[in-house]
Regions:
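A glycine- and charged-residue-rich anion-binding loop/surface
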Residues: 2-4, 8-168
């Protein structure tokens, strides 16, 4: 999101803290005073690229669990318009064969053109449906669940593509 006043520019980034989304901004030039009217716009290209990378992390997590085992646990991630990083716990380094299997599975699900669906439901209903939640995370009574066909189902508040074939 960016904000422009004559002679001023502000950059605003979405942040997730404590399970809540917020917007954090900093002035790149100029000043904004209390009571001024500002105009905000979303950087659509950056948003589309970010949602692609964010959706890909869901496929990657499921592929890692499928290839390496259900013990794989997400420890962190970074999603930006130009890249993604997925940190996870596993008891040993991945072999070249395991990496190739994960890559092939992610590519298969991208090419399968899975519908990406979002539902809001009671947290207990979501858990019973098989949606994956982050261990130790606290959730509200109502949660957002993102499903990618029958392949991946997770608690998630992020932005996503409508279909996995939009990732290719």
């Amino acid at each position: 999101i960016s904000c422009s006043l004559v002679g001023s520019e502000m950059c605003i980034r979405d942040r997730l803290r404590g399970g809540k989304f917020g917007h954090v901004g900093h002035m790149e030039s100029g000043m904004i005073s209390t009571g001024e009217t500002v105009s905000l716009k979303v950087d659509e290209a950056a948003r589309r690229d970010t949602e692609k990378n964010h959706s890909a992390t869901h496929l990657l997590q499921k592929a890692l669990k499928t290839v390496l085992g259900s013990h794989v646990e997400q420890k962190g991630s970074l999603v930006t318009p130009d890249r993604l990083r997925f940190d996870f716990a596993h008891f040993q380094a991945m072999t070249a064969d395991e990496i190739a299997q994960v890559e092939a599975l992610v590519n298969k699900e991208i090419q399968a053109g899975l519908e990406v669906r979002t539902d809001v439901m009671d947290v207990e209903e979501a858990k019973k449906s098989g949606a994956m939640a982050l261990f130790g995370e606290k959730y509200d009574q109502k949660v957002r669940v993102v499903s990618m066909g029958d392949f991946s189902k997770e608690f998630c508040g992020g932005t996503h593509v409508d279909n996995t074939n939009n990732l290719g």
